[in-house]
Swiss-Prot record:
Entry binding sites for ATP: S66, G123, A124, S125, L126, S127, S128, S129
Residues that bind Mg(2+): S129, E161
Keyword Transport: no
Organism annotation: Staphylococcus saprophyticus subsp. saprophyticus (strain ATCC 15305 / DSM 20229 / NCIMB 8711 / NCTC 7292 / S-41)
GO molecular function per UniProt: ATP binding; galactokinase activity; magnesium ion binding
Designated name of the protein: Galactokinase
Similarity comment text for this entry: Belongs to the GHMP kinase family. GalK subfamily.
Functional description taken from the UniProt entry: Catalyzes the transfer of the gamma-phosphate of ATP to D-galactose to form alpha-D-galactose-1-phosphate (Gal-1-P).
Active site per UniProt: D173
GO terms classed as biological process: galactose metabolic process
Keywords for the protein's UniProt record, in alphabetical order: ATP-binding, Carbohydrate metabolism, Cytoplasm, Galactose metabolism, Kinase, Magnesium, Metal-binding, Nucleotide-binding, Transferase
SUPFAM superfamilies listed in its UniProt record: GHMP Kinase, C-terminal domain, Ribosomal protein S5 domain 2-like
Chief subcellular location: cytoplasm
Annotated Pfam families: GalKase_gal_bdg, GHMP_kinases_C, GHMP_kinases_N
Length: 386
């Protein structure tokens, strides 16, 4: 892929690339919709991701091109035109990174050319947007020799999502893409950003990624609505509790005080955030103890909560996860990512992978009318120069 990208770069921009980098995508093993509630998450970076090449220019023009969106052509603007532009589509993500990096580093005083190509399926909820954000930051870091720490770039990526793109997401995606480590997941406390690397070894089992192949736009989904509902629950609980996030409560504490929340729907949203936080801590222990059966049961319980209490699954994700849960050799399955579409994951015996794919595909085609896709990918390092 890189050899072809170098040729494409020269034909597009008439110069050779100076630097190149890779940023992975991610799966979240468990801990869904907990990152903006001050809870724990348990993600891993994956070998699917985004590759990028870049070269400096002598003027102030920035030119961006994606092999994944060839119809868009070269997106061009200057260092003085760093505002969101709907017509610039995917290029708003790198543009946002440039905007906030430029505010922190005076060294960014020249334009540059960037070519990107990703192999994360579009709309799969495997964090292609955070991948391109951190990739852009790492390319610019190399081009201008910036003293840019990983955590600094991670936080900047979240600012791009929140302020530039208008999605009130938490920090999980950027964190795992910035800090990922091959063959390890990260248990991250999103309240403090304390984290542990945890070997992601499942013995005779593997994680299978199952894609609904239904497109979802995060900004237009109910993501922001769910966050607002959780903030509503928190403010009602704060009438009697000195807490700053739902992640500070145990399930037992929540059950004691849940009557403070007047709206039944809002109460269920909070119940998910708090119960999912407990499941994530239990899953960490289960994996450390090689208790894969319990890990699988926690995946199933997570999906049930996301379906019934948080209501972010939908018929496509439910069909994938619930069919997979019934397949012999599968210990557990759940949706991963923001929900509404995208992917589910299953913990499946290596000898049952084909059985899983056959049975889930048949059920999915029967109910939804088109086929899902399946991926088996290794766990990767975080963003890096190549």
């Amino acid at each position: 892929m890189l050899q072809e990208m170098h040729k494409k770069f020269e034909s597009l921009f008439d110069v050779k690339a100076d630097v190149r980098a890779f940023a992975p995508g991610r799966i979240n093993l468990i801990g869904e919709h907990t990152d903006y509630n001050g809870g724990y998450v348990f993600p891993a970076a994956i070998e699917l991701g985004t590759y990028g090449l870049a070269s400096k220019r002598t003027d102030r023009i920035i030119q961006l091109y994606s092999n994944n969106f060839e119809d868009t052509g070269i997106v061009s603007f200057t260092l003085d035109e760093l505002e969101f532009n709907e017509q610039h589509d995917w290029a708003n993500y790198p543009k946002g990174v440039v905007k906030y990096l430029k505010e922190e580093f005076n060294d960014i005083n020249q334009g540059f050319n960037i070519l990107v190509e990703g192999n994360i399926p579009n709309g799969a909820s495997l964090s292609s947007s955070a991948s391109i954000e951190l990739l852009t930051g790492w390319l610019i870091k190399q081009l201008f020799n910036l003293h840019l720490e990983r955590l600094q770039l991670i936080k900047l990526g979240q600012v791009v999502e929140n302020k530039f793109m208008g999605v009130n997401s938490g920090i999980m995606d950027q964190f795992i893409i910035g800090m990922g480590k091959a063959e390890h997941a990260i248990l991250l406390d999103t309240a403090t950003l304390d984290f542990d690397y945890v070997p992601a070894k499942f013995g005779d089992y593997v994680i299978s990624i199952m894609n609904t192949n239904k497109r979802r736009s995060l900004t237009e989904s109910k993501y922001n609505e769910r966050r607002s509902e959780c903030e509503n629950a928190l403010s009602q609980l704060q009438q009697q509790l000195e807490i700053t996030s739902l992640g500070e409560l145990s399930l037992a504490q929540f059950e004691k005080y849940q009557s403070l929340i007047t709206d039944e729907v809002v109460c269920r949203r909070a119940k998910h955030a708090i119960s999912e936080n407990e499941r994530t801590k239990l899953a960490h222990k289960a994996l450390a103890d090689n208790n894969f059966e319990q890990f699988g049961q926690l995946l199933n319980a997570s999906h049930k909560s996301l379906k019934e209490d948080y209501e972010v699954t939908g018929i496509e994700l439910d069909t994938l996860a619930e069919t997979a849960q019934q397949v012999e050799g599968v210990l557990g399955a759940r949706m991963t990512g923001a929900g509404f579409a995208g992917c589910a994951i299953a913990l499946v015996d290596k000898n049952s992978i084909q059985k899983l794919e056959d049975e889930v595909s048949k059920a999915y085609i029967d109910k939804i009318g088109y086929a899902p896709s399946f991926y088996h990918v290794g766990i990767s390092d975080g963003v890096k120069a190549l």
